[in-house]
Every structure is written in structure tokens, then in C-alpha cells.
């Protein structure tokens, strides 16, 4: 291809604009996470994630529609291009191979796409993406989604049989309400903080749990740090216990228990 038509130039300009929008959305999310104290609200993060998802979907659709054109175009610098001052930009434009990290992302994306295509074809049933142990047992007796993508009664029954067990198993592997997941704790809190670039020091969940245990007061227990004679003083003024049968009689008849 020697010259580009106005339509081709328009396609390239649309690609550039969509990539700029995605870059700005990602930059906005990173900035809000790094600079906000406390962290942004869940609704704010969800809104930003939706914007990024829409940008990715727009880019994916645009690249798919113009796949042939974009593959046939080669980037070559014009004689007037400032190669000395924009050497890094020129190097990126003339790359023939993807960056190793990008190549890994593309490879994982293609594998996920192939798995989704195989699952939708009905060759392995609707539960082909479930864990191997559960999927093997379910696919043996499940035919898959019927025409129009609607689940049959057998599919629904198998889904309801699998979902509670799997959800419970996943919940047990999480640390709900903590600052760090169990996986992050196993890897090391300091390593996770360094990877995420956290600037605020978050309390370790174990320390907060120990503090809660020290403050728990059970039947006959005391708050940690309370004087030893507190229990004896309370015992002197404690009223006598009421038998359970008199408590039940009061609940059913309204007759006050006998004074002892």
C-alpha cells in the first residue's frame, strides 16, 4: 500500500482517539488510587471500571472491523521526521514484535477466547469453564444449553447443585472484611504493599483480631486490664439466679417468680 485514502486516514485517526481515551481513563483510575486518602468509594471505582470496560470494548470492535487495513499498513518515517528527538517514539512504531509483557497478555487473551468459543459451541457443555473436579462430574450428565441459549431444567438443576458448594469453598479461602486477602498474606504483606505502591500504612488483620479478642467479654469474663477485684465486687451485689422453670412460667402466665 503506497498511499492512504481519506477513509483510511479517518480509520487511523479513530484508532488514535480511542487509544487516547483509554489511556486517560486508566491514568485517572491510577491517580485516584494513589492520591485519594481514604481510597475512593466503591461506586466511584465501579464507575471508572465501567468507563474503562466501554473503552476496551470500543477499541476491540474498531480493530476487528478494520483488521485487514491495519495489518496491511506499515509505519515508515518520512524524511522530515525528527528521528533524533523522537527516537523512542520511532522505535515503538517500528517494532516488529510485541513487548514481552504485552505478548503474554495477548496469549492469555487468545486462550480465553478459544475456551469461550469451545464452550459456546456445545462440545463440552455449559460448564466447561468450571473447576476440573466439578466440571467433570457435571458435564457427564449435562447436555448443555439448548437452542437460543436458554438453560434446560437439567442444566439449572446441575447449576444449583454446583453453585452453593463452589461458593462456600471460595468464601472459605477469602478473608472477608480485612485489608488483605489470604493469598496476599501468604505472599507477605510488605511485598504486596510494594507491588501496589501503597502510601498509607494499613493495619495487619492479625493485629486487629488480637485487639478484638482482648476486648471480648463473655459470661463470667472480664475486660483485659480490669482490676482483679472487679469480679468479686460484682459478685457481692449480684442477684440470685432464677430457676428456668420459673422463667418459663413467667413467660407463659405472667406470674412473677417467687422472691428467694
UniProtKB/Swiss-Prot annotation:
Protein's name in the database: Mediator of RNA polymerase II transcription subunit 8
Gene Ontology annotations of biological process type: regulation of transcription by RNA polymerase II
Gene name in the database record: med8
Function: Component of the Mediator complex, a coactivator involved in the regulated transcription of nearly all RNA polymerase II-dependent genes. Mediator functions as a bridge to convey information from gene-specific regulatory proteins to the basal RNA polymerase II transcription machinery. Mediator is recruited to promoters by direct interactions with regulatory proteins and serves as a scaffold for the assembly of a functional preinitiation complex with RNA polymerase II and the general transcription factors.
Domain of life where this protein originates: Eukaryota
Keywords carried by this UniProt record: Activator, Nucleus, Transcription, Transcription regulation
Matches recorded under Pfam families: Med8
Residues spanning the signal sequence: none
InterPro entries associated with the record: Mediatior_Med8_fun/met (IPR019364)
Record's keyword annotation contains Disulfide bond: no
Homology family: Belongs to the Mediator complex subunit 8 family.
Compartments in which it is found: Nucleus
One term under GO cellular component: mediator complex
MF GO annotations: RNA polymerase II cis-regulatory region sequence-specific DNA binding; transcription coregulator activity
Subunit structure: Component of the Mediator complex.
Amino acid at each position: 500500500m503506497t498511499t492512504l485514502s481519506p477513509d483510511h486516514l479517518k480509520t487511523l485517526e479513530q484508532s488514535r482517539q480511542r487509544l487516547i481515551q483509554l489511556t486517560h481513563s486508566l491514568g485517572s483510575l491510577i491517580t485516584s488510587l494513589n492520591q485519594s486518602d481514604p481510597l475512593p468509594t466503591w461506586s466511584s471505582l465501579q464507575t471508572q471500571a465501567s468507563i474503562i470496560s466501554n473503552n476496551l470494548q470500543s477499541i476491540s470492535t474498531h480493530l476487528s472491523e478494520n483488521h485487514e487495513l491495519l495489518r496491511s499498513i506499515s509505519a515508515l518515517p518520512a524524511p522530515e521526521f525528527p528521528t533524533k528527538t523522537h527516537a523512542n517514539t520511532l522505535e515503538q512504531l517500528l517494532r516488529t514484535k510485541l513487548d514481552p509483557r504485552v505478548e503474554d497478555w495477548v496469549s492469555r487473551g487468545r486462550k480465553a477466547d478459544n475456551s469461550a468459543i469451545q464452550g459456546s459451541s456445545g462440545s463440552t457443555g455449559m460448564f466447561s469453564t468450571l473447576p476440573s473436579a466439578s466440571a467433570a462430574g457435571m458435564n457427564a450428565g449435562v447436555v448443555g444449553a439448548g437452542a437460543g441459549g436458554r438453560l434446560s431444567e437439567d442444566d439449572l438443576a446441575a447449576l444449583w447443585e454446583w453453585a452453593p458448594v463452589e461458593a462456600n469453598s471460595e468464601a472459605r479461602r477469602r478473608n472477608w472484611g480485612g485489608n488483605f486477602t489470604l493469598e496476599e498474606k501468604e505472599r507477605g504483606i510488605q511485598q504486596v504493599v510494594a507491588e501496589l505502591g501503597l502510601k498509607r500504612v494499613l493495619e495487619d488483620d492479625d493485629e486487629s483480631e488480637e485487639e478484638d479478642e482482648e476486648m471480648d467479654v463473655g459470661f463470667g469474663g472480664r475486660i483485659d486490664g480490669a482490676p482483679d477485684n472487679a469480679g468479686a465486687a460484682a459478685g457481692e451485689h449480684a442477684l440470685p439466679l432464677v430457676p428456668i422453670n420459673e422463667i418459663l412460667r413467667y413467660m407463659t402466665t405472667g406470674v412473677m417468680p417467687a422472691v428467694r
